[in-house]
């Protein structure tokens, strides 16, 4: 099989699948991306770059659409180059939303287009209107509706689509559900496994908590409201008041990965440190950690807090469960799909810092009582999210698409409508 992966980041969700396919000499794997860093053995990485930035005067509803078109054009030019070199894929697997697969059928009309569908934006009922203190105005609702334009184009054009969780699939229009399969990326329980009595010592950042008996952990890409960072910090203030020997370790970057920045340029970390009464000697910000140190953090955790709006479920929660953490998670739909309250984790009101602190205190007061919960958390991952079990299912999903195509294709099937030859050569920006 010849396969072309398309994702502006590298290797992102396609890391393990691309690695597995490339190990088999029967497959030729090419990865189109904007990220020049990193490599995967036997994967040919090819770079594309949009011809320009989004125009500053573009209507703000359409900026995401314009960005997707520019990225789609860049991939079109890359695909034409690959075609001229003799590479014609059987399957193109593109991450939807960014735009890389937008025009790929015009270059490779016979290729199967598979799309990874992570999220479909809704003004009501999921992330956007979740916070009652931050209501949406009419302008925001209209912008959210238009933001789905590139995703809708992919839903129409693709042969098959994949969503990592059932919750995420349910965000997409029901008329496209027949195209969508639920299959998670997978977590590696052979790497994320528990180790009793692990001490948290990270010399690179001068962190030594080998003396600490109570360590509360939190891991995130960005410190932001989407992942409950303000509520988490308010809970930390309460925990510190009640537990003078408890340390809190926060892995992640001081930025916003999802949602809005503060209007004055201040970060949420800065805001919470300024407004809350905290003992900073017992709060440790590690920044983004390499995987070995991140695993060490999870192994040393007495209680791990994971909060999210009704949005994309983070790998970090599943990695924490695989490592045997007691996870105190927000009682929101993506978390409830995995955690059963009181069995393999604990659920708590996203907006209630006092309840979060109370749940943490219970775990810290009686750690032995939660040993069975730690084991059930790991069992959940091993049974349902084990990378080694899921990867063959991903390969089978790709292959099934090819088998279905071979049964339905006709030698006289007309080519889909594409660009004129003039536009093919020019692709004006």
Please place each PLM-identified region on the residue numbering.
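N-terminal subdomain of nucleotide-sugar transferases
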Residues: 1-46, 388, 419, 423-429
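Conserved acidic donor-binding segment of nucleotide-sugar-dependent glycosyltransferases
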Residues: 341-342, 346-353, 362-367
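Nucleotide-activated donor-binding/catalytic signature segment of Leloir-type glycosyltransferases, i.e.
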Residues: 252-256, 261-288, 292
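Acceptor-binding helix/loop patch of EC 2.4 sugar-transfer enzymes
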Residues: 52-62, 110-150, 190-195, 199, ...
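Conserved donor-binding/catalytic core segment of Leloir-type glycosyltransferases
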Residues: 203-227, 233-240, 249
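Aromatic "clamp/platform" in nucleotide-sugar-dependent glycosyltransferases that forms part
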Residues: 309
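Short hydrophobic beta-strand element within catalytic cores of glycosyltransferases
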Residues: 326-329
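Carbohydrate-associated surface elements
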Residues: 167, 186
């Amino acid at each position: 099989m010849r396969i072309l992966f398309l994702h502006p980041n590298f290797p992102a969700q396609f890391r393990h699948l691309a690695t597995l396919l490339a190990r088999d000499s029967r497959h030729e794997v090419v990865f189109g991306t904007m990220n020049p860093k990193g490599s995967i053995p036997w994967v040919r990485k090819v770079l594309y770059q949009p011809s320009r930035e989004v125009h500053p005067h573009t209507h703000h509803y359409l900026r995401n659409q314009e960005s997707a078109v520019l990225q789609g054009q860049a991939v079109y030019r890359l695909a034409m180059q690959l075609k001229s070199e003799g590479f014609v894929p059987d399957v193109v697997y593109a991450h939807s939303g960014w735009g890389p697969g937008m025009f790929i059928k015009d270059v490779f009309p016979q290729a199967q287009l598979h799309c990874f569908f992570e999220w479909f934006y809704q003004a009501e009922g999921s992330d956007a209107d979740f916070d009652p203190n931050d209501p949406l105005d009419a302008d925001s609702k209209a912008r959210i509706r238009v933001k789905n334009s590139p995703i809708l184009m992919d839903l129409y054009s693709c042969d098959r689509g994949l969503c990592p969780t059932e919750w995420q699939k349910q965000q997409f229009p029901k008329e496209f559900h027949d195209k969508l399969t639920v299959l998670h990326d997978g977590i590696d329980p052979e790497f994320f496994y528990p180790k009793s009595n692990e001490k948290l010592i990270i010399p690179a950042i001068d962190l030594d908590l080998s003396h600490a008996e109570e360590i509360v952990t939190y891991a995130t890409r960005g410190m932001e409201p989407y992942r409950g960072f303000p509520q988490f910090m308010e809970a930390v203030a309460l925990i510190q008041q009640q537990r003078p020997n408890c340390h809190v370790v926060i892995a992640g970057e001081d930025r916003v990965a999802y949602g809005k920045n503060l209007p004055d340029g201040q970060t949420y970390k800065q805001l919470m440190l300024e407004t809350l009464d905290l003992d900073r000697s017992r709060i440790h910000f590690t920044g983004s950690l390499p995987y070995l140190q991140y695993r060490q953090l999870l192994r040393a955790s007495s209680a791990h807090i994971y909060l999210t709006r009704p949005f994309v479920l983070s790998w970090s929660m599943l990695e924490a469960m695989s490592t045997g953490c007691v996870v105190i998670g927000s009682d929101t739909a993506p978390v409830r799909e995995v955690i059963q309250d009181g069995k393999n984790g604990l659920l708590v009101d996203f907006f209630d810092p006092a309840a979060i602190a109370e749940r943490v205190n219970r775990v810290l007061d009686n750690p032995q009582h939660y040993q069975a919960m730690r084991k059930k958390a790991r069992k959940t991952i091993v049974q349902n999210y084990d990378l080694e079990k899921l990867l063959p299912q991903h390969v089978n999903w790709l292959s099934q698409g090819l088998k279905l195509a071979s049964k339905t294709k006709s030698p006289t099937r007309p080519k889909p409508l594409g660009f004129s030859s003039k536009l093919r050569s020019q692709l004006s920006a």
